[in-house]
């Protein structure tokens, strides 16, 4: 693909790069005589850690100043005219976050971390009864999810046999929706919870959340449907309320650009938070920040949960984490949310795919020769079945790191400040983000990758 075509796309789709801090060759410690130290990197790694919004520093410094000048009194009397009293620091985030996940404001909360939130939701929603004791999820789930699922069945006295894992069929690179539905139908009478990723972290597959949720709830209304949206929130449009999802959890340090280890979020369908009706209340991991805010500081020995997802909060949230997340959510709000970004995302990832698939080093997904030199795209080639990420599987594999194709390509990219993500042993994930990446950057990144393969091909062919 020519630079002219990339620039034509860039003229069509706006970029919001100026809202973010972009690492340079110098700041990354990369020395390459072909580039000046102040040259910006091409950052295709927002699926691992999003870039820092420029406004984050100002917002965090505002809170540090409030702490410095007011101390504990900033909880109820912030020092800045635009500051939020710390007692309510997370509340301004809710109207910004809810549209990104397609929720009502009373269905979202900012709290904890992804795995701690998933554990809290499982404790609340996993209610094994009779034959319904099992959790259905994917075999290739992120390890932390597996640990959470295994732990919760063990808490109730069961073992790993109560975990049903859906595997990628032999010869395929991802799980088709029909496979998921077939496995559910096979074990329907034994399943208590279905919990899948909105987007699979390794392959980049965008699961059909609406279809899967509807199928499960139609076939077995008592089965709870939850989603790990770590790679979906801020990446693709979501409509959790309208889709009838029961619960979801996500992190904020990837596509939401809230910083490493950032505060996370949850969705709980409002039908579960009508606490004023005793028959609808279910015990959960409770804490004082989920209690009625008007009584919170009365120190009563009575838990009166807030009638919203906020009732799942256990403790007061980190002020610095909340304002870091707010700085990014305000950008999403400013540009019109995910629907306004999705068209660019679809076009940009397709642009990347078109460059790669026209290469002599591209290997079809169904190719079985593992010694053939090049790469496969293990992400669905259908744009509607993925987010912005493409996952490339390089071959042939070599146990020696210095001889492994993926490692050598990754090193070449890094020396040219093409920042992406490696998943050993053989995968590189490329994620052009519509907020701060351009088509020209995407073209250059793909070009450098193909250059790397050209440079080493004689060692394998």
From Swiss-Prot:
Q: Which InterPro entries does the record cross-reference, listed alphabetically? A: Aminotrans_V_dom, Kynureninase, PyrdxlP-dep_Trfase, PyrdxlP-dep_Trfase_major, PyrdxlP-dep_Trfase_small
Q: EC number(s)?
A: 3.7.1.3
Q: Taking the first listed entry, what is the main subcellular location of this protein, grouped into a coarse class?
A: cytoplasm
One Pfam annotation reads KYNU_C
List-wise, which residues carry N6-(pyridoxal phosphate)lysine?
Answer: 254
Record's catalysed reaction(s):
L-kynurenine + H2O = anthranilate + L-alanine + H(+); 3-hydroxy-L-kynurenine + H2O = 3-hydroxyanthranilate + L-alanine + H(+)
Q: Where in the cell is it found?
A: Cytoplasm
Q: Name one GO molecular function term.
A: pyridoxal phosphate binding
Task: Please list the cofactors this protein needs.
Answer: pyridoxal 5'-phosphate
SUPFAM superfamilies in the record: PLP-dependent transferases
- Give an example GO cellular component term for this record: cytoplasm
Q: List the pathway annotation.
A: Amino-acid degradation; L-kynurenine degradation; L-alanine and anthranilate from L-kynurenine: step 1/1; Cofactor biosynthesis; NAD(+) biosynthesis; quinolinate from L-kynurenine: step 2/3
Indicate which residues the UniProt annotation says bind pyridoxal 5'-phosphate: 114-115, 142-145, 228, 231, 253, 288, 316
Q: Which UniProt keywords apply?
A: Cytoplasm, Hydrolase, Pyridine nucleotide biosynthesis, Pyridoxal phosphate
| One GO term (biological process) | quinolinate biosynthetic process
Intrachain disulfide bonds: none
Q: Return the similarity comment.
A: Belongs to the kynureninase family.
PANTHER family for the chain: KYNURENINASE
Q: What does this protein do?
A: Catalyzes the cleavage of L-kynurenine (L-Kyn) and L-3-hydroxykynurenine (L-3OHKyn) into anthranilic acid (AA) and 3-hydroxyanthranilic acid (3-OHAA), respectively.
Oligomeric state and interaction partners are given as: Homodimer.
Q: In its UniProt entry, what is this protein called?
A: Kynureninase
What species does this protein belong to? Lodderomyces elongisporus (strain ATCC 11503 / CBS 2605 / JCM 1781 / NBRC 1676 / NRRL YB-4239) (Yeast)
Q: Which gene encodes it?
A: BNA5
């Amino acid at each position: 693909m020519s630079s002219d075509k990339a620039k034509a796309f860039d003229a069509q789709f706006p970029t919001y790069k100026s809202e973010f801090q972009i690492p340079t060759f110098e700041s990354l410690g990369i020395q390459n005589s072909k580039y000046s130290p102040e040259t910006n990197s091409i950052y295709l790694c927002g699926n691992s850690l999003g870039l820092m919004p420029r406004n984050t520093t100002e917002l965090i410094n505002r809170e540090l100043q409030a702490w410095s000048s007011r101390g504990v009194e900033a909880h109820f009397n912030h020092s800045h005219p635009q500051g939020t009293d710390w007692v309510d620091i997370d509340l301004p985030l809710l109207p910004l976050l809810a549209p990104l996940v397609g929720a009502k404001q009373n269905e979202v909360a900012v709290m904890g971390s992804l795995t701690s939130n998933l554990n809290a939701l499982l404790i609340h929603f996993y209610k094994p009864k009779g034959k319904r004791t099992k959790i259905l999820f994917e075999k290739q789930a992120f390890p932390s999810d597996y640990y959470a699922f295994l732990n919760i069945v063990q808490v109730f006295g069961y073992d790993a046999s109560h975990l049903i894992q859906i595997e990628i069929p032999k010869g395929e690179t991802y799980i088709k929706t029909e496979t998921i539905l077939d496995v559910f139908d096979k074990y329907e009478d034994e399943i208590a919870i279905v919990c899948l990723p909105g987007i699979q972290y390794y392959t980049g597959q965008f699961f059909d959340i609406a279809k899967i949720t509807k199928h499960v709830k139609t076939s077995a209304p008592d089965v709870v449907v939850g989603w790990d949206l770590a790679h979906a929130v801020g990446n693709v449009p979501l409509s959790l309320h309208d889709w009838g999802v029961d619960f979801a959890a996500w992190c904020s340090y990837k596509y939401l650009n809230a910083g490493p280890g950032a505060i996370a979020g949850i969705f709980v369908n409002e039908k579960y938070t009508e606490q004023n009706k005793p028959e609808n209340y279910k015990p959960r991991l409770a804490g004082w920040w989920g209690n009625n805010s008007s009584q919170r500081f009365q120190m009563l020995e009575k838990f009166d949960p807030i009638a919203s997802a906020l009732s799942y909060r256990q403790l007061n949230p980190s002020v610095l984490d909340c304002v870091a997340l707010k700085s990014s959510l305000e950008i999403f709000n400013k540009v019109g949310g995910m629907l306004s970004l999705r068209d660019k995302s679809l076009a940009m990832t397709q642009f990347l795919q078109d460059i790669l698939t026209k290469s002599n080093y591209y290997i079809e997904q169904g190719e079985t020769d593992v010694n053939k030199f090049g790469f496969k795209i293990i992400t669905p080639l259908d744009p509607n079945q993925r987010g912005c990420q493409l996952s490339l599987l390089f071959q042939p594999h070599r146990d020696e790191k210095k001889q492994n194709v993926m490692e050598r390509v990754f090193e070449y990219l890094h020396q040219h400040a093409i920042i992406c993500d490696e998943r050993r042993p053989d995968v590189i994930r490329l994620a052009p983000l519509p907020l701060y990446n351009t088509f020209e950057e995407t073209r250059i990144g793909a070009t450098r990758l193909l250059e790397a393969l050209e440079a080493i091909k004689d060692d394998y062919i």
